[in-house]
Amino acid sequence: MLSQEFFNSFITIYRPYLKLAEPILEKHNIYYGQWLILRDIAKHQPTTLIEISHRRAIEKPTARKTLKALIENDLITVENSLEDKRQKFLTLTPKGHELYEIVCLDVQKLQQAVVAKTNISQDQMQETINVMNQIHKILLKETHND
């Protein structure tokens, strides 16, 4: 079935990609899950735990545990909302922003090196990105309609 092969093709590149990215993250003393949340905060700050768990499709306790580690490492700050004391806004600290920039550059170099070894055109990459974004939206919608 083509749809099964389609999904399996994305699953099969995930682990090898992580293996290539891990040394970059280890060099900066950050785990992949922490990196994904740090990157999410950088792109959407100020943001909240609930927004992160929704965008990343992870459980709130998992996100909370990861956020705790990022706070302890002085990579993010937490500020109470003025309107709703239960709501807390998350932003990068200067140290967190610096780490984000450095890791982004290293990861981009890795990604560019991998793409350079293929014959993938810019148009093919853009089409794949569009399709993956479409699927991501549907999957998020499906997982939040429980």
Curated annotation (Swiss-Prot):
Residues of the HTH marR-type domain: 1-137
GO molecular function: DNA binding; DNA-binding transcription factor activity
SUPFAM superfamilies given in the database record: Winged helix' DNA-binding domain
GO biological process, one term: response to stress
SMART domains according to UniProt: HTH_MARR
Keywords: DNA-binding, Transcription, Transcription regulation
The protein's name: Uncharacterized HTH-type transcriptional regulator SAS2155
